[in-house]
Amino acid sequence: MLVEGDKGVLEPVNFVGPVTSLALIHNDKFLCCAQGPCLRIYDVSESRHESDLIKSILLPFHNRIHGMLPCKQGLFVWGGTYFAVVDVETSQVYYDRISDWIFNAAELGEENKFCVVTSKNQVHLLSLSKGSWEVTNTISCEKTPLLFCATVQISGNEIYIASASAFQQIYVWKFNYNNPPSCVSIDTYLVGHEGACFDLKFSSDGRYLCSVSEDRTLRLWSIESSPFLIATGFGHSARVWRCVFLPNKEIATVSEDLTLRLWTWNDKTLTNTYTYTGHRGKHIWSLVVSSANPIIYTGGNDGSVRSWDYKTRIQESCISVSSLFTSKTLLASFCFVKCQKLLCLAKNGEMSIIDNKGKKAIPALTTTSDMSIIRSWKNSFFVAAASNKGTIYVFSYQNTNLLKAIDLHRGKIQQLLTYQVKERYFLLSKSFVGKNQFRVYLQEFDFEADKVNLISTIELELPATFDPTSLTVDEEYSNFLIGSRTGSLALYNIGESNYLSVWRRIHEFDAISSIHIKSSKRDYLLIQTVGRDGYVNLFSIPRVEKSAVPQELCSKKCCDGILSGGLCKKLKNGKENQWVWGFHASNFFLRDETNETNVFFIDCGGSHRPWAFSMEMDIQSFASYRANQLYIYSTALNLLQRNSVLQNGLHGREIRAMDFNPSGDLLLSGSEDTKVTLLEFQSNGNIIPLNSVKFHNSGIQSLTWFSDDILFSTGGLEELNVYRLIQKPEAYLKRIVHEKLCKPNKSNKTYDGDLRITDISVVKATHLGERVLWINTVQSDSTIKAFTYNVDTKQLNCIKSWKYKTVCLVFAEAVIFGSHLLLVVASTDGNVAIWNTFWRDPQIEPLIIWIKTVHQFCVKSLNISRDQDVLTISTGGDDGAISRSILLLEQISENSVVVNSLHNYFFAEAHASSVTGVLSITKELLLSVSIDQRILLWKVEGDSLKPILERYTHVADVGGMIRNNDFLIIYGIGCEVFRLGSLR
């Protein structure tokens, strides 16, 4: 068998998966990110608005990279038993390996001299000379148990080591590396953790040691003359993987629970002061702290790298309402006129401004107790207030003599919505008339230095049961849009009272919180809406045809809770960033939705309390009212440079299905995290995430493209979803949008919450129409179903349903042979069967025309290739074997097809574990991949299969493989791309 030869065949070109290590080099200008064997280097210098990928280096390691250390020559890297020095400027790699697993390393005083700590609690001293490595000394600890982790620190000529065993003990020991002994006694034993330790760190002065464990705790130890446990930190809800000391007595930890937590400590306690979230799935594996800036970088199992500003905190102040006004009155309303400047209005018309200089009273509007609401126009000195008697006051808060009072409504004004575009100021006011009836006016104002001018007032005709909640204006084409409390959207011409169009259930029956115009054309508007239901939707809205339906280009559930607003900001690079804010339980949150990062949470009591929010890119303010107190929160967080995503990932859990579109430039991936992700596949093997949707409630089981614009996914809970690919230029990029859900049968007699649709096969049903698809699904209860789907009407109908046995069915693939549709089905009993489905006649029961036991246990992979009437079925099994059956199809009558076996190949123990992927390359060549992470190439020689080539994949928990022309992708926990080379 060829193991290391034929480098041009199955050559690894890319790996996308968990970020296992991070390091900063060159005065923290460059961030090194390790994924599998791939080392990616980013420029994260302050001068750059956005981090750029500078270089990608593929290391010749058999194991993935587990750790990195900045050194004089560039970067010292280790993974498993391998280690290397990488010259990041020339991409030169000097590597070697030792016999034991490496846990940590340090650079000694001299150049190209290092020490590594291994799993046997030994230290190897290494020297690099003229490109060759030498182990100059090996120092053993007196205790040599199996280790879980270790750390090392150099102080003068001393090497200090802390190592944690599988028996929950921590050993601290040291020696002089200029005169190293062969064996070293232990200085300190530390005992206290109730589970294995996963990381250890010395403080910079060497006085303290931090440890984290599977018992979910962080522990801080004093390791001076009389070692003892200082404190234990509780807060993580799952295993804690990494820790690091920060300046000013702070510690950062990351965990399986997807949180980055900051801790402060003193001589007795550890306190969790701040928690950051943003990674997806499970596990944050790595973190590193910048010494140049207050930034922490984290790398997750989802493959993303994120940066966090850990110094900018939220400042809180509390002011009694009674101290704001001269008389005994109640607070009516408040709003931000700009960030950190809050304008408060009392019932009797008194006003006060609160800013970072304190509070200041301004002249009152009126002396009657009838004021109800106040709102501001962003970035102006003008505000609008309303009374319970229907009067609107528009004025400058800097000079209340610039006042215009307008008696407009007949009763209490319940809502004011403001909108500014260039020098035009719009105000929408609403009062209650009757049940589901409102009187609404739209006014336009012009503000001069000494006067407030009312340009126009229009009473709007509202659609039935339309309660306005949001407003936006399209000045270019003189339109405005109003969102309602029940998820409807109405389009008007400026200056006209009648609405042009109304569209219902844009956000089902929940309120539209904000509307943003992304593009304005003569025939349509491209708008983004934020709904109280937690969704951000992108629509193409027609201007002309009243009956036309908005086309949904994207719909994304942002988070749990309710969304109260959103903001889009165009960046210097031409891209747009989306922020949303709202409430979850008693917390107010601001979220960077583009990067799927929570910026901050504030415990304010919930959305039912009066509140106000204002944000700029470098400052944010929130205020809430409860118990006659105003609570004001401010932070100076730079939203464009902090808490951002440097590298996007794929999935936070195992990828269970992938498929190429027919054109080969797009990929679809589905994972245990229940998300379906659209990816761009580039000609060099790079994979770029485009967008993801979540419409499954359990892990994805299978995916398939039918055409370049129609795709399907299946999962647990009997879920079958249909999607459409949107590629219109106004959508800015390719997106998948949800089109149809096949709802399970939930009758008491038949519904099974554990029932899974394990695979799907889709072909065109030309005998039923050009736009009709025939869908076959197989289920875990041994049921096979046949559906028709009309692409135009989106109608999904079940045509047939039948059972195989009682075992789980795992794969299905349709083959059209003449006028027949044959369905190849694999199951957990090791059988592969071919059914004649009689798809042209719904009344005829499907019939098994061929069945064979190909494995002792479950069939784990299935591949079918066809050459006219010859069908080749390749399988991999739970028994580690591979099988190949070559069959001849023959139609002997109009309703009858027979299958004749031409040849059967079988190789027992082909792999050491389940074979999760098989792929026919040619008639003579077959590829297989297994949980054992080996890729094998097989060749047909006579009556047998012979392995001729072996490659290793860094993908753990391999789920399968797919091919696209010259590329092969192995997927599981992440995915790895190989170039087939001459195999193609």
From Swiss-Prot:
Its main location: cytoplasm. Transmembrane segments: none annotated. PROSITE patterns: WD_REPEATS_2, WD_REPEATS_REGION. WD repeats lie at residues 14-52, 142-183, 192-231, 235-275, 278-318, 326-364, 366-407, 461-502, 507-549, 650-689, 695-733, 752-797, 806-845, 854-899, 910-949. SMART domains: WD40. It comes from the Eukaryota. It is found in: Cytoplasm; Nucleus. Keywords: Cytoplasm, Nucleus, Repeat, tRNA processing, WD repeat. This is tRNA (34-2'-O)-methyltransferase regulator trm734. The gene is trm734.
